[in-house]
């Protein structure tokens, strides 16, 4: 069987991301040959936590990005596409408007294509598959944490998922609910920590963190923390991928981000401008997870992967 060119699109609460890759015969299990990767911050989940609805302007931003992605599918001759919508799309009452838009835009490139909503369990499975495909077994079992805008997936396993939980907390949701001042007040940060612990509690009952040997962090908050810990003057995905961040360095960066203004965060060289207003919330989630992993599993280091649910989606198209 020849290689097949596939496209994966992950539409989350904060970003919409595209991967075009070759899969199939001649490649190792879990291996992809990247053709194109791209991320756009569209904040689809803007206000969803408060209103339960997608805002018209958020759908418009997402449509603009998806239209560009559809053109790239045609340009790169993608044969199959799978677009998944995660936390934000699970929570809204007007999601039919969103899915009709995706069918209209994607259908122009590959007829019959449209986004699909996936469960938290499916999201965890795809994130795990994308993250551990190239890690081998030396550091297993892995606890993979995919920290998104609206939810955080926590997954334990080696080659297959042993336990997983999708916690109803992410950097956008936490920021909109708790962190209203600029910079956040001590009271706001304290309230945010309590909410994070409350939302993580069922995950900690479900996923036996004490069995883990390696903590793998995915998505924009995690990769940006690695970039800052490495004092990068520009975002370098190759240097971030599989980087290891010592616990002390991780907590120092988190504390610094939480106390900064949005303008100060935006001025940091590796910071994506669409992430500056919510990464403080993400840093609080990371701090709480770091504490739990240190206490429960003795893990005091974060391994950061650039490969995540997007890679898992692409691999799912390989059969």
Swiss-Prot record:
Question: What superkingdom does the record give?
Answer: Bacteria
**Per its UniProt record, what InterPro entries does this chain match?**
ATPase_NBD, GppA/Ppx_hydrolase, Ppx_GppA_N
Q: Could you say which EC number(s) this protein's record lists?
A: 3.6.1.11
* Record's catalysed reaction(s): [phosphate](n) + H2O = [phosphate](n-1) + phosphate + H(+)
Q: What single Pfam family name could you report for this chain, choosing any that match?
A: Ppx-GppA
MF terms (GO), sorted A to Z? exopolyphosphatase activity; pyrophosphatase activity
User: What broad class of enzyme is this?
Assistant: hydrolase
Query: Gene3D superfamilies given for it?
Result: 3.30.420.40, Exopolyphosphatase. Domain 2
Which Gene Ontology CC terms are recorded?
A: plasma membrane
Tell me which UniProt keywords the record has, alphabetically.
Hydrolase
Stored SUPFAM superfamilies: Actin-like ATPase domain
- rRNA processing recorded as keyword: no
What the record says about family reads:
Belongs to the GppA/Ppx family.
Task: Outline the subunit composition.
Answer: Homodimer.
What this protein is reported to do is described as: Degradation of inorganic polyphosphates (polyP). Releases orthophosphate processively from the ends of the polyP chain. Prefers long-chain length polyphosphates as substrates. Can also hydrolyze ATP and ADP substrates, but lacks GTPase activity. Cannot hydrolyze pppGpp to ppGpp.
| PANTHER family hit by this protein | EXOPOLYPHOSPHATASE, EXOPOLYPHOSPHATASE 2
Q: What is the protein named?
A: Exopolyphosphatase 2
Please name the source species.
Mycobacterium tuberculosis (strain ATCC 25618 / H37Rv)
Q: Which gene encodes it?
A: ppx2
């Amino acid at each position: 069987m020849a290689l097949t060119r596939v496209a994966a699109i992950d539409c989350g609460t904060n970003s919409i991301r595209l991967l075009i890759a070759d899969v199939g015969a001649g490649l190792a299990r879990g291996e992809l040959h990247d053709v194109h990767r791209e991320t756009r911050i569209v904040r689809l989940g803007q206000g969803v936590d408060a209103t339960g609805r997608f805002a018209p302007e958020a759908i418009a931003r997402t449509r603009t990005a998806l239209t560009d992605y559809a053109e790239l599918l045609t340009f790169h001759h993608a044969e199959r596409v799978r677009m998944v919508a995660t936390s934000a799309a699970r929570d809204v009452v007007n999601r039919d408007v969103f899915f009709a838009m995706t069918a209209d835009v994607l259908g122009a490139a590959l007829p019959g294509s449209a986004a699909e909503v996936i469960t938290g369990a499916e999201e965890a499975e795809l994130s795990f598959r994308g993250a551990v495909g190239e890690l081998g077994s030396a550091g297993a079992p892995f606890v993979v944490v995919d920290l998104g805008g609206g939810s955080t997936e926590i997954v334990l396993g080696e080659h297959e998922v042993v336990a997983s939980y999708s916690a109803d907390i992410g950097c956008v949701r936490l920021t909109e609910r708790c962190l209203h001042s600029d910079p956040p007040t001590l009271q706001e940060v304290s309230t945010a920590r309590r909410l994070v612990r409350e939302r993580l509690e069922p995950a900690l009952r479900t996923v036996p963190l004490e069995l883990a040997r390696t903590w793998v962090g995915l998505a924009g908050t995690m990769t940006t923390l690695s970039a800052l810990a490495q004092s990068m003057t520009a975002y370098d995905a190759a240097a971030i991928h599989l980087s290891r961040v010592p616990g002390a360095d991780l907590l120092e960066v988190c504390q610094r981000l939480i106390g900064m203004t949005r303008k100060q965060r935006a001025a940091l060289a590796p910071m994506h401008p669409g992430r500056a207003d919510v990464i403080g919330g993400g840093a609080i989630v990371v701090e709480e997870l770091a504490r739990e992993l240190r206490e429960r599993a003795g893990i005091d280091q974060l391994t950061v992967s650039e490969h995540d649910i997007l890679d898992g989606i692409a691999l799912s198209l390989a059969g």
